[in-house]
Amino acid sequence: MVLSDAEWQLVLNIWAKVEADVAGHGQDILIRLFKGHPETLEKFDKFKHLKTEAEMKASEDLKKHGNTVLTALGGILKKKGHHEAELKPLAQSHATKHKIPIKYLEFISDAIIHVLHSRHPGDFGADAQAAMNKALELFRKDIAAKYKELGFQG
């Protein structure tokens, strides 16, 4: 799967909006993930106790983790598909330490699209959404290949 230069530009244009408030976007995305797929919360020992959206919004740890997640993703997206060096340690930790199934990466991808659309409706139209979906699908495909190399059937 390859994105055109124009598609990558759409991805990076919306990502510039994310970078104005990485932690806030990350927190919103994690809240959307946990509300939509409560089973994903079980993978996070330090967040398991957060049961309500209000508790999640009040959690500085959740906000920090959202910042970490989106900072890593931003670094990958900026490589425009040439993300081997960034992907390898991420796949290693998510396969061997955290044991995060690929399905959960699909769930967070959906949460990313939803939050970007809700926060930036004028800047995240159908073309930008399609480009971001394609970029996230490329990321998932490549991380799934790394999982396979590591013997993780996530």
Swiss-Prot record:
Gene Ontology terms: biological process: removal of superoxide radicals
GO MF assignments: heme binding; metal ion binding; nitrite reductase activity; oxygen binding; oxygen carrier activity; peroxidase activity
Subcellular location: Cytoplasm, Sarcoplasm
PROSITE patterns: GLOBIN
The keyword Phosphoprotein is annotated on this UniProt entry: yes
CDD domains with a match to the protein in the record: Mb
Enzyme class: oxidoreductase
Pfam families referenced in this protein's UniProt entry, alphabetically: Globin (PF00042)
Keywords assigned: Cytoplasm, Heme, Iron, Metal-binding, Muscle protein, Oxidoreductase, Oxygen transport, Phosphoprotein, Transport
EC assignment: 1.7.-.-, 1.11.1.-
Residue positions binding heme b: 94
Self-association state and partner proteins as the record states: Monomeric.
Similarity comment: Belongs to the globin family.
Role this protein plays: Monomeric heme protein which primary function is to store oxygen and facilitate its diffusion within muscle tissues. Reversibly binds oxygen through a pentacoordinated heme iron and enables its timely and efficient release as needed during periods of heightened demand. Depending on the oxidative conditions of tissues and cells, and in addition to its ability to bind oxygen, it also has a nitrite reductase activity whereby it regulates the production of bioactive nitric oxide.
PANTHER family: MYOGLOBIN
Protein name: Myoglobin
Organism per entry: Eschrichtius robustus (California gray whale)
Gene: MB
